[in-house]
Amino acid sequence: MEKIAPELFLVAGNPDSFVVDDLLDFSNDDGEVDDGLNTLPDSSTLSTGTLTDSSNSSSLFTDGTGFSDLYIPNDDIAELEWLSNFVEESFAGEDQDKLHLFSGLKNPQTTGSTLTHLIKPEPELDHQFIDIDESNVAVPAKARSKRSRSAASTWASRLLSLADSDETNPKKKQRRVKEQDFAGDMDVDCGESGGGRRCLHCATEKTPQWRTGPMGPKTLCNACGVRYKSGRLVPEYRPASSPTFVMARHSNSHRKVMELRRQKEMRDEHLLSQLRCENLLMDIRSNGEDFLMHNNTNHVAPDFRHLI
């Protein structure tokens, strides 16, 4: 170990009071080490030696002298100041970076109080970091849909929409009223025209629709017109609401209509046969009388009166 210059540790006020050369004289260290390898000192001697050294060192500081009274060269003082400034700047730079990251505050002034404030235990910094992080964390939102969102409605826009709906609703009502009036006029026209109109087949006056018949358009009622269009309109067919409907002669059922027609045909045939028989008898009588009359005129009977 190199020797330290003795003039560095001279006492500034009283150089004769204490000399550090005796304490820092390590010239005989090698010899003492060699001797110590051969003979080890006792524990009692060691303890007494340490006690004397401690008493000497305490007397060194109690005599009114200290480290502040020591003489230190200017170069060493400049190096110490540079080292202290470097440490302060390094601590200040790290803390400033943390503050900028966490809270965005301005750079703090590097004073003695701020240095003591910045040197804090780790848990407090973690707690501050957690609080600031929770306050600045942005909550993730849901992904926006592609559907266009309607603008936020206000009371003015709602009033405008209500006014527009009120303006459109009267137009719709007017249209409905006009359509109803037009339908009523059509019904009135049909009623007026149908008041003097009758079905030429069943003589009915009320029908939902007038249809085309053998005498032209709108000459048959709806029921008779449908049967006429299908070729089944016969004299025996009459709707039940017809004023000329007779149960014995008419029906609104096709099956019964066909039966009535068959019965009528049978009656007609019977009548025709009777007429034929009567005509034959009439012909026979007329022919016999004509024969007798013809014979009487052409042939004269003999006269037998002379025989009597």
Curated annotation (Swiss-Prot):
One of its GO terms (cellular component) is nucleus. Keywords: Activator, DNA-binding, Metal-binding, Nucleus, Transcription, Transcription regulation, Zinc, Zinc-finger. Residues 34-57 are annotated as: Disordered. It is found in: Nucleus. GO terms for molecular function: DNA-binding transcription factor activity; transcription cis-regulatory region binding; zinc ion binding. A zinc finger (GATA-type) spans 193-247. Pfam families: GATA. Residues 39-57 have a biased composition (Low complexity). A motif (Nuclear localization signal) lies at residues 142-149. The keyword Repressor does not apply. Its main location: nucleus. Transcriptional activator that specifically binds 5'-GATA-3' or 5'-GAT-3' motifs within gene promoters. May be involved in the regulation of some light-responsive genes. This is GATA transcription factor 9. It comes from Arabidopsis thaliana. The lineage of its organism: Eukaryota, Viridiplantae, Streptophyta, Embryophyta, Tracheophyta.
